[in-house]
A protein has these predicted regions:
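Ligand-binding loop in jelly-roll beta-barrel domains
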Residues: 22-60, 164-165, 173-199
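Double-stranded beta-helix
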Residues: 22, 46-89, 150-152, 189-222
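Structured loops at beta-to-helix junctions and adjacent beta-edge loops in soluble globular domains
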Residues: 52-55, 106-107, 111, 141, ...
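Glycine- and acidic-residue-biased ligand/ion/polar-headgroup-sensing regions
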Residues: 1-15, 33, 110-111, 122-167, ...
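A short glycine-rich, His/Asp/Glu-containing loop-to-beta-strand
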Residues: 79-135
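Secondary-structure boundary elements
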Residues: 40-45, 58, 94-97, 142-145
Length: 222
């Protein structure tokens, strides 16, 4: 997430991986490690590292995902515009071998919504929907700010959470969305795990019309 660290994975050593001072100051560096290996992470000064994992039977060598392999772009438009960084996804990094795990980052500007329209990924019904467990780790900048995260489904179940700096939330099922408080930027790194690495989601049908406005809003400069 920030700083540099040296990784020793089995008999391999990766010196001073990283570089950005914080999550907003550049693209991430990552190290993909196969299951069952011993590893050591040595901090090279102040460092913050995220360690997502998922069961895997893939036998591969450890590899580094540098900023040159990170896919960036924009999702949405206007006040639901957010920037994404795909670190380990089937769509963004099809050349990288992985099993079950999907990783990326999203930066939501002041007052904007993310994961909007709200979507879900709670059952395997490909190509329409793929089941994935999901976890978010949030940073809020400046750190005294907050955001709001909403989960809901058809049961009915509805939960709303205040998101603060260093909040961790899970999204095992249901529709979910996040909004940044005005004056604050919300960063989140998302980890998904499932049998399929294809990201197929279903939007809330009551709000899915919003997606159809993106081309028009983009053309108008929003």
């Amino acid at each position: 997430l920030g700083g540099k660290a040296t990784f020793e994975v089995g008999n391999k050593r990766f010196e001073k991986v990283g570089g950005r001072p914080n999550v907003l100051a550049g693209l991430p560096h990552s190290v993909y490690m196969p299951a069952g290996v011993d590893f050591t992470i040595k901090a090279e000064g102040a460092v913050q590292v995220a360690l997502p994992s998922a069961p895997s039977d893939l036998e591969i060598e450890t590899y580094v995902i540098g900023p040159n392999l990170v896919t960036t772009g924009v999702w949405g438009a206007a006040n639901f515009r957010r920037d994404f960084r795909q670190i380990l996804t089937e769509a963004g990094q099809p050349q990288l071998p992985a099993r079950r795990l999907i990783v990326g980052e999203t930066i939501t500007p002041s007052g904007n919504w993310s994961t909007y329209p709200p979507h879900r990924h709670e059952k395997d019904d490909l190509p329409r929907e793929a089941y994935h467990e999901e976890m978010y780790y949030f940073k809020v900048l400046p750190a005294d700010g907050f955001g709001i995260c909403r989960y809901y489904n058809d049961d009915p179940v509805e939960e709303n959470f205040t998101v603060r700096d260093n909040t961790i939330l899970m999204a095992p099922k249901g529709y979910h969305t996040v909004v940044s408080a005005p004056g604050y930027t919300t960063y989140l790194i998302w980890f998904l795990a499932g049998e399929h690495r294809t990201q197929a989601t279903v939007e809330d049908p009551n709000l899915s019309w919003v997606t159809k406005t993106v081309p028009m809003l983009t053309e108008l400069g929003h």
